[in-house]
Amino acid sequence: MPIPEFIKSLRAKIGTELLHVPVATVMAYDKKGRLLLVQDKPSGLWGPPSGIIDPHELPADAAVRETWEEAGVFVELTHILGVFAGEHFSHVYENGDQLAAVSTVFAAQVIRGTPRPDGMETSDARFLTPAEINALPCSAHFKVIRKATSSVETRAYFKPASWCPEGLLSCGPEDFF
């Protein structure tokens, strides 16, 4: 999805100044235990689907929506892996816009869909094994998330997603099997 309208409106007021935004990120696994990654179109780097949480949108809904938009895969969120921020979650775009993200990272299971890039933000989308991931150029924020969540044993509460792809009447796992 292109730049959200509320970000464009803020940019018109603040220019390229640093903007702090909430982001949802999804570590989604298929039945074979492979991780869904997307290749960022501008940079060529690989990482999990993620994106800005729109005003009044639940983080869980943003996570499910972004995974659908960027990779064509519908997921069921299982738990929160962590909340991340810092230098590896900041970016300066080619036009000078500065962004610092606070990312809520969710674990998820794939319910439906075959990975496909959106063609705007992502140029590739695949399920990958750890060995395949190790051979790819990955984003700094993904490296931080991957290292920090490799041994997570506790689960945090979150309100489950209610967002559903347009045209589907119901989105529970039982509706897809």
Annotate the PLM regions.
Residues M1-T25:
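Acidic, metal-coordinating catalytic segment for phosphate/diphosphate chemistry
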Residues L18-H20, N95-V102, G119-T122:
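A generic structural micro-feature
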Residues V21, D30, K41-S43, P48, ...:
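Short connector loops at helix/strand junctions that flank enzyme active sites
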Residues A28, V105-Q109, R126:
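Short, well-ordered beta-strand micro-motif
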Residues D30-E70, W163:
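Conserved Nudix-box catalytic region and its N-terminal flanking loop in Nudix hydrolases
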Residues L45, P115-F177:
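Nudix hydrolase/Nudix homology domain
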Residues F74-F84:
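A short coil-to-beta-strand element that immediately follows conserved catalytic motifs
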Residues A85-T114:
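Active-site-adjacent beta-strand/loop module that shapes the phosphate/pyrophosphate-binding cleft
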